[in-house]
Amino acid sequence: MITISDGVSAGARQDDAGHVLADRLLVLGFEVDRASVPDERPAIEAALREGVVSHELVVTTGGTGLTPRDVTPQATLAVIDYEVPGLAEAIRAAGRAKTPMADLSRGVVGVRSRTLIVNVPGSPRAALESIEALVPTLHHALETLGGPFDHGAAGAGQEARPDLPNPEAPR
């Protein structure tokens, strides 16, 4: 998990969104490594490239808005092999149900190699709501990226990749 924030990376601000996300990802069964980088495209790109080396999922929080320093989507687009627009749309749709301001988030979801990269907003509430929007499909997405997967097999899921976290874990 990568927090993109000038204040957090400088130690001048607490990483509230990062704490909330890490807690939820742990409950979902993920091992969570955390990093923070400033709102600078080269730093974000480097952190993403480093994260995909050893993780099946990389979640970023912050830098998805409209200010000139919100460059997380541009950095992500430079790193990924392809986008998964349906997941980004699901995040925005879930947020839109709470506030029309969710449509101002430019977060991207995409894949580099076999790693899913997800951008979520920097506010703790919006970040958590974004992850919750992905819970129904996250497990299947990671299974599909993780290797051979028989999409037609009855009951394909945990049996196919028991090493993956359980998306049905309680909140």
Tell where the protein language model's regions lie, with residue ranges.
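Non-catalytic beta/alpha edge segments that cap or flank active sites
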Residues: I2-R171
